[in-house]
Curated annotation (Swiss-Prot):
<feature type="compositionally biased region" description="Basic and acidic residues">
    <location>
        <begin position="744"/>
        <end position="754"/>
    </location>
</feature>
<feature type="compositionally biased region" description="Basic and acidic residues">
    <location>
        <begin position="562"/>
        <end position="591"/>
    </location>
</feature>
<feature type="compositionally biased region" description="Polar residues">
    <location>
        <begin position="755"/>
        <end position="771"/>
    </location>
</feature>
<comment type="function">
    <text>May negatively regulate the snf1 kinase.</text>
</comment>
<feature type="region of interest" description="Disordered">
    <location>
        <begin position="562"/>
        <end position="726"/>
    </location>
</feature>
<dbReference type="GO" id="GO:0005737">
    <property type="term" value="C:cytoplasm"/>
</dbReference>
<feature type="region of interest" description="Disordered">
    <location>
        <begin position="466"/>
        <end position="502"/>
    </location>
</feature>
<feature type="region of interest" description="Disordered">
    <location>
        <begin position="1"/>
        <end position="61"/>
    </location>
</feature>
<feature type="compositionally biased region" description="Polar residues">
    <location>
        <begin position="518"/>
        <end position="531"/>
    </location>
</feature>
<feature type="compositionally biased region" description="Low complexity">
    <location>
        <begin position="660"/>
        <end position="676"/>
    </location>
</feature>
<feature type="region of interest" description="Disordered">
    <location>
        <begin position="739"/>
        <end position="821"/>
    </location>
</feature>
<feature type="region of interest" description="Disordered">
    <location>
        <begin position="514"/>
        <end position="541"/>
    </location>
</feature>
<feature type="region of interest" description="Disordered">
    <location>
        <begin position="384"/>
        <end position="422"/>
    </location>
</feature>
<dbReference type="InterPro" id="IPR039301">
    <property type="entry name" value="Sip5/DA2"/>
</dbReference>
<feature type="region of interest" description="Disordered">
    <location>
        <begin position="205"/>
        <end position="272"/>
    </location>
</feature>
<feature type="compositionally biased region" description="Low complexity">
    <location>
        <begin position="598"/>
        <end position="612"/>
    </location>
</feature>
<comment type="similarity">
    <text>Belongs to the SIP5 family.</text>
</comment>
Length: 821
């Protein structure tokens, strides 16, 4: 039984689904761009449910359609908005072309003529209604040029945007025929007769029907009689219909009543002539110039309510209120001190954004508005409700100048008095843009959000700068307590080691804001002293969340900027320290180099020739100053240095003082006669020094035996000429010992280097007395300068040799003193 019910319900379900798809496609046609596609997909899915068709490739079209739908749904919001704006622009262009082709008001248009290319942000519906009511001038076509001598067909060509023909040539498209006066009188009589026979006043009858009758070539008796059903239907049925609508509007909703209250637009008689002239020629024969856009329009322009200046409708709809801004008086005294605080003053200014009414562009009178006096005829669109309070506009009388009796006559005189902004005939800029209040409210809300962000920045700045100052001065007792708890109880000003305190304080501030109100409402004073006490109102919860989120973001940005600034300062400090360290090293190096130069200068001063009367320099001074060059010279003396010490002795000789020439003058003949000329071009080598090791050791033992006498070492080194004789004997002994040990010519090189060591021990040099050429001395100097410094063992041996030389010098001095005595 259940199966039979299932079998019975299945077909009905499929049929109902098909019917629902059909109904849905029929009802949703034209409303949703995706409705047809969804319905077609539903039907396709029913058709392609068979698996065998999907195997053959005939099915699966629904999958492709679903993929196409998903692709359409993936478009971004910006793309949808751009597509919507493009569609709206195309629709506006099409509607504008249609309106200019089919609609007009007294020869003017209901859409702009392209004088201004900006955004049309005025309310187009309100402007259209005001133009149809003849309270605002229509958008006349402006002429770039105008001449009073133009003929009618030239005026028609200029008004229609065609090239202006010559005065004596009428183009075929501008030819017209004046309506015969007989036909006009017949139409007038027929309309008067029809009006007299009508028993019910014409209230809401469509004027298009009457215009068709008036413009038809049928005689007056062709009109239906009032007793005919057509006439009764046209005259009485609208009346009963309006009563029914009135009764129905009392019981219907507000929306229906608003729709019914909108006045109905009617088409007035289509008559292209006014007083026998084409309507274009009648309008533009006395054209005037708009003082703002400098185009020529018919004389029926808007007039300012204050100074009675003409202004076209396109210029009028461009004038609007200024954007919301703070009051001007607040800008003047913005520098004045505000005891309430800078943040509160800024909040008050942001909340008090104002937008003054537009001022007159001519006399700068506020509450700018215009008044419009329409032409004495009526053409185009009108409202059906206007016929009750005005003369019958459906009659041909409206096409004549007799209608001007019901309106204010247009004269050349200007209005002597200004009209009030609340006058019913005055149209202000606020009426054209009634959304100015909403824009002001939006601007104030935006300013409030910006003020909240500024407050967050100020709060973050205060929290970051409050490390060095106490929190009790500004009433942040509870905030400071929370910060102290987060910072480990360190709340004393100037506490070191609080690098993360700004972030902790900021988040402590936010945590304190989110805390329940019971923690902060214990004391009224504490509650009023808080910067931003928590608000628990459910109505403003979203605003509070937004404000706190903005505050957290502002604090994060502020902390990031502060961290970046601190890193930059540390980097600058490190660079400065490196620069100072480099300068200090450079100065130390320069000082070291200057000290070395001073030592060289002192040594060169010692090497200069001295007077023979000066005392001799002791050997202790020569052991302190290092030598840098080997002075050239000859002499016969015993080599007292080992092969490893030869280079050191050669370099130390230059620092010792030069010996006066009187000491060695007697020695030169004997030295030159006892030994052959030396070869100074070859530098002294350790191989040459090995030959004099026995002589050095024997002479050292001799000197040690002689130095045991205590009286000799204590004698002063004095005497000038008498010291030459013992030095003579000493050099002769050294030469004899050297001759015994030498076996080849290499001994000459050793003897050549012996005077340098002798002069080092005795602090006297034979550099100034040698007969060697300058080239040889230069070679010896260059060879000595290349040698390296001695090792530790060589320096010790050198010091021992210097002591031996000193004792030998003392022995010679003592012998010299004994011989003289």
């Amino acid at each position: 039984m259940g199966n039979s019910q299932t079998k019975e319900t299945r077909p009905s379900h499929s049929q109902s689904s098909r019917r629902s798809h059909q109904w849905g496609s029929g009802s949703s046609h034209g409303r949703s761009p995706y409705g047809d596609r969804h319905n077609s997909e539903g039907s396709r899915s029913h058709r392609s449910s068979r698996p065998d068709l999907s195997i053959l490739g005939l099915g699966g079209s629904s999958d492709r359609d679903v993929a196409t739908i998903l692709e359409h749904r993936r478009e971004t919001k910006q793309e949808r908005e751009a597509r919507r704006l493009e569609k709206e622009r195309a629709a506006r262009i099409k509607e504008r072309e249609r309106s200019m082709r089919e609609e007009h008001v007294d020869g003017g248009y209901l859409v702009t003529q392209g004088v201004y290319t900006g955004t049309e942000d005025f309310n187009k519906a309100i402007v259209r209604q005001l133009m149809i009511e003849r309270r605002l001038a229509p958008f006349w076509r402006g002429l770039n040029d105008f001449s009073d001598s133009w003929t009618e067909h030239q005026l028609m060509a200029a008004a229609r945007g065609l090239p202006i023909p010559p005065p004596d040539e009428i183009p075929p498209e501008l030819e017209y025929r004046n309506p015969p006066k007989v036909v006009e009188e017949a139409k007038e009589a027929s309309n008067i007769q029809s009006v007299q026979h009508l028993m019910v006043p014409i209230t809401s009858r469509s004027a298009s029907n009457g215009s068709d009758v008036s413009h038809s070539s049928q005689p007056a008796h062709s009109l239906p009689s009032p007793s005919s059903p057509i006439a009764s239907g046209t005259s009485s049925s609208p009346l009963f219909r309006s009563r029914a609508k009135t009764l129905a509007s009392l019981t219907t909703s507000r929306h229906n009543s608003q729709v019914d209250s909108t006045p109905q637009e009617i088409q007035l008689p289509r008559d292209p002539f006014v007083n026998g002239q084409p309507i274009e020629a009648y309008l533009y024969k006395d054209a005037i110039e708009c003082p703002i856009c400098f185009l020529y329009y018919p004389p029926y322009l808007n007039r300012t309510r204050c100074c009675d200046q003409p202004i076209c409708s396109e210029c009028f709809v461009q004038i609007k209120r200024p954007d919301p801004h703070p009051p001007e008086h607040a800008d003047s005294d913005s520098n004045a001190p505000n005891p309430a605080g800078e943040t509160e003053r800024q909040d008050v200014q942001d909340i008090q954004l104002v937008s003054e009414p537009a001022a007159c562009p001519f006399c700068v009178q506020p509450e700018f508005g215009v008044a419009y006096v329409p032409p004495p005829f009526r053409r185009g669109l009108a409202y059906a409700s206007d016929s009750s309070g005005r003369p019958n506009i459906g009659t041909p009388v409206s096409s004549t100048s007799s209608l001007s009796s019901a309106t204010t006559p247009t004269t050349g005189r200007r209005r002597a008095t200004s009209l009030s902004a609340t006058d019913p005939s005055v149209i202000t800029t606020d009426k054209v843009r009634p959304d100015w209040a909403q824009k002001l409210a939006n601007a104030r809300a935006h300013a409030a959000r910006r003020s909240a962000a500024a407050t967050a920045l100020h709060t973050a700045a205060y929290l970051m700068n409050s490390n060095g100052s106490g929190g009790d001065t500004r009433g942040f007792s509870m905030r400071r307590g929370v910060m102290r708890r987060n910072n480990g109880g360190q709340d004393s000003p100037g506490t070191p080691g609080r690098s993360g305190s700004p972030a902790l304080q900021a988040f402590a501030f936010l945590t304190d804001r989110r805390a329940p109100s019971g923690q902060e409402t214990d004391s009224a004073e504490e509650g009023t002293s808080n910067l931003a006490p928590p608000r628990n109102s459910s109505r403003r919860s979203r605003m509070d969340d937004l404000e706190e989120m903005m505050m957290m973001e502002a604090i994060r940005l502020s902390l990031a900027s502060e961290e970046e600034r601190r890193k930059r300062e540390e980097k600058e400090l490190r660079k400065e320290a490196k620069r100072r360290e480099k300068e200090a090293k450079k100065a130390e190096k320069m000082a070291r180099k200057a000290g070395l130069y001073s030592n060289n200068a002192s040594s060169s001063a010692l090497e200069s020739p001295s007077d023979s009367r000066l005392p001799k320099v002791t050997s202790s001074s020569s052991s302190i100053i290092g030598e840098e060059r080997t002075p050239p010279g000859k002499g016969k003396a015993v080599e007292r240095v080992t092969p490893s010490q030869s280079n050191v002795d050669l370099t130390e000789t230059a620092s010792s003082g030069d010996v006066p020439s009187s000491f060695l003058e007697p020695q030169q003949p004997q030295s030159s006669s006892s030994l052959g000329p030396p070869v100074p071009k070859e530098p002294s080598k350790p191989s040459h020094l090995r030959h004099v090791s026995s002589a050095s050791s024997s002479f050292s033992s001799l000197v040690e035996s002689m130095s045991e006498e205590p009286g000799l070492s204590a004698q002063p080194h004095e005497g000038t000429s008498s010291s030459a004789e013992p030095l003579f004997n000493f050099r002769s002994l050294a030469a004899v010992i050297g001759d015994e040990d030498k076996s080849d010519e290499a001994a000459e090189h050793v003897e050549d280097t012996a005077p340098h060591t002798t002069s080092e021990g005795s602090t006297s040099s034979a550099a100034n007395l040698t007969t060697a050429p300058a080239g040889e001395s230069a070679v010896s100097t260059s060879s000595t300068a290349v040698e390296k410094g001695p090792t530790v063992e060589e320096s010790q041996e050198c010091s021992v040799n210097k002591e031996i030389e000193t004792r030998s010098m003392e022995v010679t001095d003592s012998r010299n003193s004994e011989t003289t005595s």
